[in-house]
């Protein structure tokens, strides 16, 4: 294998795939990136056996071939090189020579044949959406994924492709985030599946504001193929979480008794300030709604007290409810709307956060002290 590539292209390719590589693997091959050169493209593939990321970039290929190289070493060397052009050459013993300006390095690799194979997907179940759309949907929901490994089916996002609508849901049992968008879905591509958190994190990192993403899925795997207008392409293949996702519709409260309109930014920063005065033992903030006013208080015997007041649009009865501040801050951080709405039934029933758009967030209240 022999090729010339710019430092920028080499870094782009390595940055796209290296996050999936585990530093604690017992299999040396999984610390390596598979590098394949052909047709003036250089393809990088990395995997932890659950999630695989492949990326293709432009290069001047003089002689094609494939090998595997320790990804952290290759990335660290490339990042520190001062020249913008790099020559890579790999011999029959999988030793990779790197030349750039006055720098020369050799890295010992492993044979490409040792790298785990990647399943090829058929086109039977697939849907294509704008990357920007999927990126926004992921951002609005993924913060609510459960980290409790005992509830395995909640350790990812639920994706439903039905009746020309893509619905994405995440919940940890104490809160639930849901968003949906109109999408063109053929009859044979309809279905639903659970994408694990690690693949969701990779998608959040790699989805851009341009180009499309094609989603293909089978019984236990899904593939996300990303392409932008600059010829940069990434493929993420992930195992799916097995099991039945809970019926999330039944936790969405019926019609609310009270509805309040709030300025998102002001509400967010008031909550962030109040959260400073909470503690492990007293980790709630109280929201007291009066006519066109919201009073936010946090009280912790070992820390102190916080009081905030903001103007809101509210004409209902006086009402107070308490929440874990993090569970309100997370969705407000993920949204970009100027205005948000909170719908309430009473102090013991879940609150619902909404926007003027396809998004809904249900959060369990805490006991008022």
Feature locations, PLM:
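Structural preference for solvent-exposed beta-strand-turn elements
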Residues: 1-369
